[in-house]
Amino acid sequence: MLNEQDSVTEHRSRRKIKFALLGPAFIAAIGYIDPGNFATNIQAGATFGYQLLWVVVWANIMAMLIQLLSAKLGIATGKNLAEHIRDQFPRSVVWMYWIQAEIIAMATDLAEFIGAAIGFKILLGIPLLQGALLTGLITFLILTLQRYGKKPLEFVVGGLLFFVAIAYVIELFYSKPKFIMLGMSMLLPILPNREAVFLSAGVLGATIMPHVIYLHSSLTQDESKTASRSERYSSTKLDVAIAMTIAGFVNLSMMATAAAVFHYGGYTGISNLDEAYLTLSPLLNHTAAIVFGLSLTAAGLSSTVVGTLAGQVVMQGFVRFHIPLLLRRVITMLPSFIVISFGIDSTRILIMSQVLLSFGIALALIPLLVFTGNVKLMNELVNSLWIKLIGWLITIVVIILNIYLLIGIII
């Protein structure tokens, strides 16, 4: 009898540990539903209907594997990806990596910050500059949660992720997509023209986020006193599966809603978020438009927090330089205010930032695969042969797409 009770107690204890370890992937997943995703998915859906849904599906599957490898690196070694690059690569290469990672982090932050500002503009009817100031203030408040430990921040960011997911369940309900066409487009790879390739690269850059690859390895690198490495890795697999499935659903819903409402409603030229909001109201109803504005704001606010955290990890990891998070937030806000002040097309900036991000994916992936495939570093958590093959295949696909994009830009 005592043995049975001990067994039940141990099982409950392990289950508590498993759930206590959930959370880091939800912070990482926020990077996959930022305003850049809104802009790219809406333009892709409005222009090509359901045709590019397969890109979202495969990009999300790739992202799941990549985030799992990043988290696994932190668990197995107690160091994040940037720290491993600093320790094992030549100094000149480390500085090159740091500079490109900072540029990518700033491009990401630009997209996220402007997206949240657009959300406030839509909801409150205020100028974009005031929306940007409000975004900065709320981001500061969310970042102060870090002084109370990781869990409060994980709880808030995870809550915003669920909010955006629920918002898009509502959007799907109102838009009434053609589910047979939707399902077929998720399976059939089609790239009708060069613009589709450009938008696909944007979708890839918006779905697989280089800065989140660096961040996730830092979120799991702390030693746990209550769980073994195998237990932590087991919990991480569940964490990544749940969080990335939610993020994938949101991205699919964004594109499917845009396809159903705009493309098949005859509004194939929708190219910015303000236009999308204004068109949603007469085509569906005012509630759908408000839900869109709320989800954009929530995604923008949460992803700016994640972007700031990632920027700090990149700076500390590569060059051992630390500045207070709030000061970093002020510095990274400046490009957004410049874009807004000069009246540059904010949605175009969002999409271009996502294409820029796609160029940083391979640079993060190559060292990640090298380190997680090293048995001396990873021990029993080293990548299997299949994982190595799939990882390098993903890297090759990303590089080929980037080369195609570069040729297209030059020509």
UniProtKB/Swiss-Prot annotation:
Record's bilayer topology term: Multi-pass membrane protein
Gene Ontology annotations of biological process type: iron ion transmembrane transport
Database matches in InterPro entries: NRAMP_fam
Domain of life of the native organism: Bacteria
TM regions (residue ranges): 19-39, 46-66, 98-118, 122-142, 153-173, 196-216, 242-262, 289-309, 323-343, 349-369, 390-410
Pfam families: Nramp
Subcellular location, principal: membrane
Purpose of the protein: H(+)-stimulated, divalent metal cation uptake system.
Protein name listed in UniProt: Divalent metal cation transporter MntH
Gene name in the database record: mntH
